[in-house]
Amino acid sequence: TEQMRKIFESLPLIDQDRLAGWKIPFLRDWLSHPERDKYWERTSMGDGYSKIRASAFSVGGWFDICLDGTLKNFMAMTAPSIDPAVRGGQRLLVGPWVHSISRDGKTGELDFGKGSAQDFRQLQFQWFDSRLKGLDSGIDSLAPVRIFVMGRNVWRGEREWPLARTQYRDFYLGSGGKANTRQGDGVLSAAASASDTPDRFIYDPRDPVISSDEGPYDQAAKELRPDILVYSTPPLEADLEVTGPVRAVIFAESSAPNTDFTVKLVDVYPDGRAMSLCDGIIRASFREPGKKPSNIEPGK
């Protein structure tokens, strides 16, 4: 609605709840603590994983806003330093979902088939029957890690996360300085670009790129904006599975003392659709993890 649009466009963020008609204490707390301080430390696991004696059934979705935390928790609970009995009891399930499980196989603008849906309540019963009642519920007959391979639209069992057989590959951004829009000259290649010409864009906070909802949505229309840089590979000649951690390293400068950078990994279909796979965002002042936030020097 028009009212909600005005609320979302208002500043400062901390007052948006008041404009909506009610105060949200936890949101105000979060916005009042932008740095990692004692407020956040008190809820951080830190080295507390070694004290956990219980098994955990970790469930997430490839488009879940909480997926990063879910995977990090599972990795911490299956680390070599964890007691083998506890480590062996952990399970991970990741499907083509957002923060809630799709019951009809549809997420965002894609249909992954009814086989992608899971009877989560039944899985919960099996889990608790095994872990709390000591019954043979069949849950341990499943692989410790079960992931849904999108594109092939099949479930696959694995032994660990990240997958031990992962082959990490580097791809490089390149252009002749005109990577703006999907019609520009930006390329994504396995070989580093010989050109050092920078790509430029003008960011107007009064006309931001609107985020899509959770899930896979077509980004083609957004990629026509001149404030978006697009780097694409040639059409792939063979299937390429991307399963595991994805990281983008960018070198940028800005005329502003602080700004945000967003990177999206997108799957371009033969019909021109550009379906989002994953994305990440960073505020420039937080560019050095673990260090105190600092503004950038304009032009550097």
Segments the model singles out, each with a brief description of its role:
Residues 52, 58-60:
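Short beta-strand/loop motif that positions the catalytic acidic residue
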Residues 80-106:
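Catalytic histidine neighborhood in serine/cysteine hydrolases
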Residues 32, 68-90:
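Active-site-adjacent alpha-helix of alpha/beta-hydrolase-fold enzymes
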Residues 50-52, 84-87, 162-165:
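Extracellular/periplasmic catalytic domains that process cell-envelope and extracellular macromolecules
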Residues 63-67:
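Acidic catalytic loop of the alpha/beta-hydrolase fold
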Residues 1-51:
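Accessory cap/linker subdomain of secreted extracellular hydrolases
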Residues 2-17, 102, 108-300:
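C-terminal, loop-rich substrate-recognition/catalytic regions characterized by aromatic stacking residues
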Residues 45-51, 82-83, 135-139, 239-241:
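Surface-exposed acidic, glycine-flexible loop patches that form ligand/cofactor-binding
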